[in-house]
Amino acid sequence: MYSLTTTRYFLRRAKKFFKKHPDLKQAFEDLVEDLRHDPFQPHFEYHHLGGKLEGVQAVSLTRSYRVTLTIVLTEKEIILLDIGTHDEVYGKR
């Protein structure tokens, strides 16, 4: 099982995100629980990012919302970095 860590930035973004989208809180909790068991399940649409987000990965919360993260395989740790719409997370504002 993977351990889970968050950044301060993620906590601020998540607080704002769930204030706007309280209906997605359960989906996020389910996603996190599934990630902890196996972060490479196909339904996450797990993918590596490029450009200024090189070295970061992303998974889908819903069709419209993404969670960016880093997975440290040697330590079995997942670090949550950001949550939001595709454009918010990938910096296209």
Question: Model-derived features: where do they sit?
Answer:
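Arg/Lys-rich, positively charged N-terminal/basic patches that mediate binding to nucleic acids
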Residues: 1-31
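Enriched for short, Lys/Arg-rich terminal
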Residues: 12, 25, 61-66, 70-93
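A generic structural signal for beta-strand entry/edge sites
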Residues: 1, 56, 75-77
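A short, surface-exposed loop/turn module that caps and links secondary-structure elements
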Residues: 34-59
